[in-house]
Amino acid sequence: MGILSYLCYSLFYLSIFFIIRLLFQSRKFKNLPPGPTSLPIIGNLHHLKRPLNRTFKALTEKYGNVISLWFGSRLVVVVSSLSEFQECFTKNDVVLANRPRFLSGKYIFYNYTTLGSTSYGEHWRNLRRITSLDVLSNHRINNFAPIRRDETQRLIKKLAEDSSTKFAEVELTFRFFDMTFNNIMRMISGKRYYGDDCDISEVQEASQFRDMVSELLQLSGANNKTDFMPLLKFLDFENLEKRVKRIGEKNDVFLSGLLQEQRSKKERTNTMIDHLLNMQESQPEYYTDTIIKGLCLAMLLAGTDSSAVTLEWTMSNILNYPEVLKKVRDEVDTHVGQDRLVDESDLPKLTYLRNVIYETLRLYTPAPLLLPHSTADECIMGGYKVPRDTIVLINAWAIHRDPETWSEATTFKPERFDKKGELEKMIAFGMGRRACPGEGLALRAISMTLALLVQCFDWKRINDEKIDMSERDGFTMTKLLPLKAMCKTRPVVNKVFK
């Protein structure tokens, strides 16, 4: 009875506090962006129907391109137009270079010390320097080209097993995820986790890590109400904080194991971990174990799911538009032919394929809300005052479908990128100081895979119906239904893989 009374009194006083806070918000924060009326304690959380990018777009159509919402006690501003986005990351770029402090940053991203979770400052500049020089420089990306070539060719061989004489049905979704995971893991540690030549224990280890990532994404952003409502953090009926902490502990065991395994080897190789461990010997203050594990985690989170879903969406579009498939195939055959396989050096010539990828990124942006930003100081957005410590979300999905920015905004039209200036409107990788540093690596891997798939196989849909392009809700926008298709090998497969 005592505990019940305590909870009742706590709820009562917290309710009074939030009601008073709500009444004084309009006085404290003048000239905020418009938005729907918020409720005590929960703010606008009751407005957040899934998926969020579509909900925000609907609210934008009612209140304007810059809107404000209260996620519990935290103010959130959502930007949904290209002009305001560009204002944010030119004039206000430094002000918006911080990240919000969520539970995931504390327990999973090493107490806000990873590249994606840390706020702007000396530590971030150090991480960015390490990433630019030691992880994602052109030299390092070129060094890993044989890995990308090998993984894509393994995919081709696997698909060709049943399709050498006739069309065969193949499942592509999980193959893309396995391939991109192998790509990044081989860059990081030299290990393959999926394939016929892999040890079952390593497959289980990778599956456990993927499950951790899946649970992490489910508990990120608006899904974790304790990040926005102090009362829930205090009560924590759903054990959300404990769950996030447990994920962080499991994640650290996995990454620490990778470092220990590389350290135990007699000879260092060309992997990312080995290179960073070599740097640790001469500059231990910059290349700590925590920083190395954080960089590995950033590569795995940013370089696997996003690339895999982009491959899936792009192949779905290619299959839904036979004329697009024909143009891509003709381009590959013209510049490469059927006597050898596509190489990364051929990619600059495949401009129509590039357009197809960008058009897919436009309509099916892998991270529809990008990564959240936080204001380091008060600033002006779209003529409105935005206070310090406001969470800022960019609805890239809505911006990419804005009819004021794009002609035939919802139509799949790759040739639009032949027009000068269109590519500058793309924001799938962000903009400014906190733009994604892995854009070059991602586009190389995606382009290489798609070029080989079109060069090596004839493709068609399983039936006459178009592939369902519905999306699943989540931080990463995946297809609702896994992608399946029919393929049959072309002559180059027999010539190269005798």
Swiss-Prot record:
Pfam families: p450. It is an enzyme of class 1 (oxidoreductase). Coiled coil: none annotated. It comes from Medicago truncatula. Involved in the biosynthesis of the pterocarpin phytoalexins. Acts on isoflavones with a 4'-methoxy group on the B-ring, such as formononetin and biochanin A, and on pseudobaptigenin. Has a low activity with daidzein and genistein and no activity with the 7-O-methylated isoflavonoids isoformononetin and prunetin. It catalyses: formononetin + reduced [NADPH--hemoprotein reductase] + O2 = 2'-hydroxyformononetin + oxidized [NADPH--hemoprotein reductase] + H2O + H(+). GO terms for cellular component: endoplasmic reticulum membrane; membrane. Its cofactor is heme. This is Isoflavone 2'-hydroxylase. Induction: Down-regulated in roots by drought Up-regulated in leaves upon infection with fungus. No regulation by methyl jasmonate or elicitor treatment. Disulfide bonds: none annotated.
